[in-house]
A protein has these predicted regions:
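Second-shell loop/turn segments in exported
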Residues: 109-117, 125-131, 151-157, 172-182, ...
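Substrate-binding/active-site groove segments that recognize
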Residues: 154-177, 188-197, 209, 216, ...
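Short, structured secondary-structure boundary patches
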Residues: 125-126, 145, 152-154, 158-163, ...
């Protein structure tokens, strides 16, 4: 009888099965796989590149201009060659004519009265500095207006100083002890322009590009460098030049021609 009861209990357990047998496995998709490390002679299999998160701007590219330099000043450089191989002292006339006649020109010509005020204040210093050089006083006046609007105390965030915005290295190079002294600053700026005239065959476009970006940048890029500021700077100074030469008793034709300003009291 006792054996019969034990047999009956065992049968009942066999029919029910273990508790929780029908419950899902805790990690049904989890499997173990043993992977051997690569041998020392085996090269890397995976290259991991970490980039900016999706939706977050790349800080390096976010600071770049939204349009290319060529787009910003294309109205000028599409017709006037920026290449160093096109260097010529005489092409200033065609460049100025293009500036004055193209409807696409976004630049605003400086007021004659503003240029006249600068000429009246610094006439003597400009004439003295340009004697015996290849730099027209009208070009100096145009550069001063573009760089500082005639403000002797002007100082840029990049460290350029004075009327013609000389950086310390250029000021030191051309013997300017006090860049905020008008006469010294003009002497240094004219000396630099004259030196650049000799470097770039008297081509005013390349000279102005080098004055803005450095002669090394012009040589490196084989002409006017593709910098937005420089590509805009050159036609801007040439536009000021076209107004400044109207203040000369005999308007200069080349950027190296002499000029005697018609100023108040003269």
């Amino acid at each position: 009888m006792k054996r019969m009861i034990i047999s009956l209990v065992c049968c009942l357990f066999a029919m029910c099965g273990p508790a929780g047998a029908d419950a899902p496995k805790p990690f049904p998709d989890f499997t173990f796989k043993r992977v051997k490390p690569p041998s020392t002679s085996q090269g890397p299999r995976i290259t991991v590149q970490i980039g900016p998160k999706t939706g977050e701007p790349d800080l390096a590219s976010a600071s770049q201009p939204t349009s290319t330099p060529q787009d910003q000043a294309n109205w000028f450089w599409s017709q006037i060659s920026p290449d160093i191989g096109s260097a010529s002292a005489g092409r200033i006339e065609g460049a100025v004519n293009h500036i004055q006649t193209t409807a696409a020109n976004p630049l605003v010509a400086p007021r004659l009265a503003d240029l006249q005020n600068i000429a009246s204040t610094h006439n003597t210093d400009i004439l003295r500095a340009t004697v015996g050089t290849r730099v027209s006083p009208a070009l100096v006046l145009a550069v001063i207006h573009t760089e500082s609007s005639g403000n002797i105390a002007e100082q840029s965030s990049a460290g350029a100083q004075g009327l013609m915005q000389l950086i310390p290295a250029t000021a030191d190079r051309f013997g300017v002890a006090d860049p905020f002294d008008a006469a010294q600053n003009i002497n240094g700026g004219v000396a630099y322009l004259d030196w650049l005239m000799g470097q770039f065959d008297g081509d005013p476009l390349l000279v102005l590009a080098a004055y803005n970006a450095g002669e090394g940048a012009v040589r490196e890029h084989g002409g006017v460098p593709p910098f937005a500021e420089t590509r805009t700077y050159v036609p801007k100074v040439l536009m000021a030049w076209s107004v400044a030469r109207g203040l000369c008793r005999t308007p200069p034709q080349l950027a190296s021609d002499g000029c005697v300003f018609i100023v108040k009291g003269s």
